[in-house]
Amino acid sequence: MPLARDLLHPSLDEEKKKHKKKRLVQSPNSYFMDVKCPGCYKITTVFSHAQTVVLCVGCSTVLCQPTGGKARLTEGCSFRRKQH
């Protein structure tokens, strides 16, 4: 680790590792995402830190399950982060 670090222009990797309140510009860790069901290929919008089990609207398959932080996607589900 170098002794001289540029505090005004930190690298993107350093900023991602910091706590959300300690970043140069505060930003949340959570986001919304489009999750595609592996069975019926319908797209459902899911919160990244969902606290309840999310089911598919079409076939009632479990898309994600809550953990302590981020929700765990079911195997076979693909997702895309939504742009704001």
UniProtKB/Swiss-Prot annotation:
Needed cofactors: Zn(2+)
Entry-linked InterPro entries: Ribosomal_eS27, Ribosomal_eS27_Zn-bd_dom_sf, Ribosomal_zn-bd
Compositional bias ranges of the Basic and acidic residues kind: 1-16
Entry's Gene Ontology BP terms: ribosomal small subunit assembly; translation
Record note on cofactor: Binds 1 zinc ion per subunit.
One annotated Gene Ontology cellular component of this protein: cytosolic small ribosomal subunit
Region (Disordered): 1-23
Signal sequence segment: none
Zinc finger (C4-type) stretch: 38-60
Alphabetical UniProt keywords: Metal-binding, Ribonucleoprotein, Ribosomal protein, Zinc, Zinc-finger
A molecular-function term among this protein's GO annotations: structural constituent of ribosome
Record's protein name: Small ribosomal subunit protein eS27-like
Organism of provenance: Bos taurus (Bovine)
